[in-house]
């Protein structure tokens, strides 16, 4: 380099390290309608000022690095940088804050959940200045959400495909989840569907193991579906898990399911990844099957209150990536989930416009710009005594999935399915008559059991089963 060039470089660039807050903490900034907004729960290391920590979050999740670099002068940092535009202490928590960051839309590739998450949460969570960090919520602007296809079909189209209206859908996960042969698996599916369920389901870890290869399972299951449809006159389905080691193999399995006229297939969206999920969602829209999404591995990411990503963010990103169903917890079953928080992200899955409501953990107003909704699936440790609460909490646009609560019936799978269908229809009728499900739920179930021996037997088996543990992740 010539001496003249060195002189010019020294004149325009000063090497060294400067505080993040000098560039990335901008409390005077007013977010734009086109900005992606993020709310982080931030716990600084002792001695680190919260404004410096907030600025570091904005910097490390956008354009910043640990030192000043001369290439900063080759672009417009003011245009592309993330901005921490405020923070507030978390009530009842010591040295913990909600930090708000605005990201300009140009930082993100259109239609890519993978790129968006890589930018916002890909690196900053390991930053030493932070003791813990959790992404609580995102506001996706209309201009960005319109670059996503979203769910392949959505709730309204699903109801039309199934010709089922005015009640929640009923499902069941086949148990034991592993170890059945394909033929016995198909037999279990048939018994559940003929008893009155709308769907049965592969468990999340049923892929293509030595005891039951995927092709054999698909064939026996479709046999069961067609037989049960012929007997009941209702449209039935089974969530055929197309999750596979490679995207190419996943599409191969999906195509085989479509050749068999399978109405719905399934994907494990977190373990398989967002790129894989978006690929399958687009394929489903083009080829017809509904897409059921399982959230296997979510609790590794979302269960800790102080560090990770809240499930409401994972639910939003799934709606963008694509899925017609998504497991959402139950509130009353065996899995983690408080009522207010669960209802908050259920609305974010289903509704077109959701107002800010901090009491339900919703930090930002979200407008989905007519993107189709995702049907929440309540699953995990539920049985007929939970039915009134489930109908009250989730309403009609949901799928209530009873695994052990169907297959554990003392008379077998079909009577277990009958018990669930009778309980559901009794609760829907009572609600439509104006009765209070929360207060009269047990009485409604007992009244229905007088006319259904299958339901009466189920009431006796599960009368003492409760899952009363304190929720770890509360608002």
Swiss-Prot record:
Naturally occurring in which organism (per UniProt): Cyanophora paradoxa
Protein name as annotated: Ribulose bisphosphate carboxylase large chain
Binding sites annotated in the UniProt record for substrate: 123, 173, 177, 295, 327, 379
GO molecular function, a single term: magnesium ion binding
Pfam families membership: RuBisCO_large (PF00016), RuBisCO_large_N (PF02788)
Misc. remarks from the entry: The basic functional RuBisCO is composed of a large chain homodimer in a 'head-to-tail' conformation. In form I RuBisCO this homodimer is arranged in a barrel-like tetramer with the small subunits forming a tetrameric 'cap' on each end of the 'barrel'.
Gene Ontology CC annotation, any one: cyanelle
CDD domains found in the cross-reference section: RuBisCO_large_I
Catalysis performed (reactions): 2 (2R)-3-phosphoglycerate + 2 H(+) = D-ribulose 1,5-bisphosphate + CO2 + H2O; D-ribulose 1,5-bisphosphate + O2 = 2-phosphoglycolate + (2R)-3-phosphoglycerate + 2 H(+)
Reported function: RuBisCO catalyzes two reactions: the carboxylation of D-ribulose 1,5-bisphosphate, the primary event in carbon dioxide fixation, as well as the oxidative fragmentation of the pentose substrate in the photorespiration process. Both reactions occur simultaneously and in competition at the same active site.
Domain of life: Eukaryota
Cofactor note (record): Binds 1 Mg(2+) ion per subunit.
Keywords of this entry: Calvin cycle, Carbon dioxide fixation, Cyanelle, Lyase, Magnesium, Metal-binding, Monooxygenase, Oxidoreductase, Photorespiration, Photosynthesis, Plastid
Gene: rbcL
Site (Transition state stabilizer): 334
Organism lineage: Eukaryota, Glaucocystophyceae, Cyanophoraceae, Cyanophora
Binding positions for Mg(2+) per the UniProt entry: 201, 203-204
């Amino acid at each position: 380099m010539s001496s003249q060039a060195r002189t010019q470089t020294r004149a325009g660039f000063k090497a060294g390290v400067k505080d993040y807050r000098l560039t990335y903490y901008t409390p005077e900034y007013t977010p734009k309608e086109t900005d992606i907004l993020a709310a982080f729960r931030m716990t600084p290391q002792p001695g680190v000022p919260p404004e410096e920590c907030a600025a570091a979050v904005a910097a490390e999740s956008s354009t910043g690095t640990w030192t000043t670099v001369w290439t900063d002068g080759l672009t417009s940092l003011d245009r592309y940088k993330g901005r921490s535009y405020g923070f507030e202490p978390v009530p009842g928590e010591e040295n913990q804050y909600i930090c708000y960051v605005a990201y300009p839309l140009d930082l993100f590739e259109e239609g890519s959940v993978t790129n968006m998450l890589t930018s916002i949460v890909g690196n900053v969570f390991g930053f030493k200045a932070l003791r813990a960090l959790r992404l609580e919520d995102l506001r996706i602007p209309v201009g960005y959400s319109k670059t996503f296809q979203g769910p392949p079909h959505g709730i309204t189209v699903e109801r039309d495909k199934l010709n089922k209206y005015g009640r929640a859908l009923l499902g069941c996960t086949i148990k034991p989840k592993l170890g059945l042969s394909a033929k016995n698996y198909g037999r279990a599916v048939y018994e559940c569907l003929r008893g009155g369920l709308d769907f049965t389901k592969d468990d999340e870890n049923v892929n293509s193991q030595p005891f039951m290869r995927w092709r054999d399972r698909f064939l026996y299951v479709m046999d069961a579906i067609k037989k049960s449809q012929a007997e009941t006159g209702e449209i039935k389905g089974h969530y055929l898990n197309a999750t596979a080691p490679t995207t190419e193999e996943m599409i191969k399995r999906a195509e085989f399911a479509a050749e068999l006229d399978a109405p719905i297939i399934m994907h494990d969206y977190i373990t398989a990844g967002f790129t894989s999920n978006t690929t399958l969602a687009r394929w489903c829209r083009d080829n017809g099957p509904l897409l059921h999404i399982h959230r296997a591995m979510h609790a590794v990411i979302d269960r800790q209150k102080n560090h990770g990503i809240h499930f409401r963010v994972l639910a939003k990103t799934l709606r963008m990536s694509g899925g017609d169903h998504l497991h959402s917890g139950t509130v009353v079953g065996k899995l983690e989930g408080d009522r207010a928080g669960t209802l908050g992200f259920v609305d974010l899955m289903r509704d077109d416009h959701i107002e800010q409501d901090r009491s339900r953990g919703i930090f930002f107003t979200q407008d989905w710009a007519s993107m189709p909704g995702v049907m929440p699936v309540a699953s995990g440790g539920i049985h007929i005594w939970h039915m009134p609460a489930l109908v009250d909490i989730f309403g009609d646009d949901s799928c209530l999935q009873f695994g052990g609560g169907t297959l554990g019936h003392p008379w077998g799978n079909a009577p277990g399915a009958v018990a669930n269908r009778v309980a559901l229809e009794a609760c829907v009728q009572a609600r439509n008559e104006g009765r209070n499900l929360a207060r009269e739920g047990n009485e409604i179930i007992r009244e229905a059991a007088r006319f259904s021996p299958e339901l009466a037997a189920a009431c006796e088996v599960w009368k003492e089963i409760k899952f009363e543990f304190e929720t770890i992740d509360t608002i």
